[in-house]
Amino acid sequence: MTLILGIDPGSRITGYGVVRQTARGCEYVASGCIRTGSGELHERLQIVFRGVSEIIAQHGPVTMGIERVFMARNPDSALKLGQARGAAIVAAAEAGLEIAEYSATQVKQAVAGTGGANKEQVMLMVMHLLKLTQKPQIDASDALAIALCHAHTRSSLVPHGLATARRRGGRLRL
């Protein structure tokens, strides 16, 4: 059994999802959103860092998947997204989690079967795979999808690749 944290980073809303990976698949543990409000950027980044740190302390995941930054139309938005991502990554690194990064296309492919899936299709597959009866918030749904993608990728790497990386004290990069 492995607890996996998925993070959908954002400078205003960061989604998180925690799943338990077992021999039979994945089970839902928790999900939600870290809302930073509209303060100064450094204050919002601190909220993301503390929020992710609290989630890690509460649930005890051993690994984290996080979405890569995509090039947005607005360069300022892409920079802020990258900074929020960095705050989440530092929180996970401080806690000793293994960290893997995935593109949005990789996440959609792993969860919905096509890299061109829309948010609604991804959410419906997340609900189906985790046997959820209510729709999660969209950012939480995306984070759960990232956690599921990470679980799927991990299961294809175990036992050889991940075990080797862990033994050598290295970081697994996907």
Swiss-Prot record:
EC id: 3.1.21.10
Residues the entry annotates as binding Mg(2+) 1: 8, 139
Free-text remark on how the cofactor is bound: Binds 2 Mg(2+) ion per subunit.
Reactions catalysed according to its record: Endonucleolytic cleavage at a junction such as a reciprocal single-stranded crossover between two homologous DNA duplexes (Holliday junction)
Residues the record lists as binding Mg(2+) 2: 67
Keywords: Cytoplasm, DNA damage, DNA recombination, DNA repair, DNA-binding, Endonuclease, Hydrolase, Magnesium, Metal-binding, Nuclease
Pfam families attached to this UniProt entry: RuvC
Protein's GO biological process: DNA recombination; DNA repair
GO CC annotation terms, alphabetical: cytoplasm; Holliday junction resolvase complex
Recorded superkingdom: Bacteria
Catalytic site positions: 8, 67, 139
Single GO term (MF): crossover junction DNA endonuclease activity
Cofactor(s) this protein requires: Mg(2+)
Top-tier EC class: hydrolase
UniProt subcellular location: Cytoplasm
Assembly and oligomerization: Homodimer which binds Holliday junction (HJ) DNA. The HJ becomes 2-fold symmetrical on binding to RuvC with unstacked arms; it has a different conformation from HJ DNA in complex with RuvA. In the full resolvosome a probable DNA-RuvA(4)-RuvB(12)-RuvC(2) complex forms which resolves the HJ.
Similarity comment: Belongs to the RuvC family.
Biological role: The RuvA-RuvB-RuvC complex processes Holliday junction (HJ) DNA during genetic recombination and DNA repair. Endonuclease that resolves HJ intermediates. Cleaves cruciform DNA by making single-stranded nicks across the HJ at symmetrical positions within the homologous arms, yielding a 5'-phosphate and a 3'-hydroxyl group; requires a central core of homology in the junction. The consensus cleavage sequence is 5'-(A/T)TT(C/G)-3'. Cleavage occurs on the 3'-side of the TT dinucleotide at the point of strand exchange.
Protein name: Crossover junction endodeoxyribonuclease RuvC
Native source species: Pseudomonas putida (strain W619)
